[in-house]
């Protein structure tokens, strides 16, 4: 039993075959259906519940913040996904943070943070961490036997969709995404969570792995992510994320 928690990444936005939420979608080319296909091809019997909701953020606080600054946010992981994780799940994957970082930078663009934008970003990273703890606790309460595999964030400031953004916006996106990865997600390895390290994976920064919007992966991008998820599920030992790498400070 595999429950996937995520946003449009889970439904495969940007892929050649995108899935609708909550469907098995066996022919999808996002990382969730590709992961399911690869596991089935290796002989695993697998039932999939893809809980991904496009535009979703981690918690109600980020949903409210985004709506205050005119972002379309259809839901959040804690309220609309966590309660529906399959109770007999053996694997749960979580990919959170991309829409949350974009919400933070949108708020900054709308004047939030005033003269101390760094402090605002850091406060939002802490709020994200509190939400992530709530999400994990709820998932473990629903599916106590599940192996939990999470993906950290790449440095969003370096992705193609922000190539023409202002230096200030890119610096904020870097501070938020690196903060989320290093202070919230990577430390989860101490809680028996497997962390897939997109932050320090050079493939996460190759423009050829992204769709035309520069934010969502294409089939190639989702393919490499699925390969890592499958490796994490099937390996007895998966490498811990890097403590530091050049990608964390790519924007001066």
Placement of each model-derived feature along the sequence:
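Short hydrophobic segments within beta-strands
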Residues: 5-6, 151
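Extracytoplasmic/secreted proteins, especially bacterial periplasmic and envelope-associated proteins
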Residues: 4, 30, 34, 80, ...
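Structural motif
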Residues: 1, 90-93, 147
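Catalytic His-Asp segment of secreted/periplasmic serine-dependent ester chemistry enzymes
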Residues: 153-252
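A structural motif corresponding to the C-terminal end of an alpha-helix
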Residues: 36-44, 131-149, 179-197
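Solvent-exposed loop/turn segments at secondary-structure junctions
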Residues: 8-12, 53-59, 97-103, 154-159, ...
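Active-site segments of SGNH/GDSL-like serine hydrolases
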Residues: 98-99, 108-109, 136-174
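Conserved SGNH/GDSL esterase-like catalytic core that processes O-acyl groups on lipids
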Residues: 13-130
């Amino acid at each position: 039993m595999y429950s996937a928690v995520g946003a449009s990444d889970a439904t495969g936005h940007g892929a050649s075959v995108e899935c609708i939420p909550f469907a098995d979608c066996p022919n999808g080319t996002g990382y969730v259906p590709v992961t399911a296909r690869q596991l089935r091809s290796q002989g695993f019997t697998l039932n999939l519940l893809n809980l991904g909701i496009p535009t979703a953020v981690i918690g109600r606080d980020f949903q409210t913040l985004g709506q205050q600054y005119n972002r379309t946010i259809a839901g959040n992981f804690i309220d609309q996904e966590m309660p529906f994780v399959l109770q007999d799940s053996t694997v749960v994957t979580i990919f959170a943070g991309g829409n949350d970082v974009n919400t933070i930078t949108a708020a900054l663009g709308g004047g939030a943070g005033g003269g101390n934008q760094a402090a605002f970003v850091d406060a939002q990273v802490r709020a994200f961490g509190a939400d992530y703890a709530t999400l994990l606790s709820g998932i473990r309460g629903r599916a106590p036997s599940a192996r939990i595999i999470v993906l950290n964030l790449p440095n969003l400031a370096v992705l193609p969709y922000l190539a023409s953004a202002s230096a200030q916006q890119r610096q904020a996106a870097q501070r938020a995404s690196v903060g989320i990865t290093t202070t919230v997600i990577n430390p989860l390895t101490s809680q028996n969570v497997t962390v897939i390290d997109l932050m320090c994976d050079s493939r996460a920064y190759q423009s050829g792995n992204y769709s035309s919007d520069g934010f969502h992966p294409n089939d190639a991008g989702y393919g490499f992510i699925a390969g890592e998820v499958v490796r994490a599920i099937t390996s007895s030992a998966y490498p811990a994320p890097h403590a530091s790498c050049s990608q964390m400070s790519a924007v001066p």
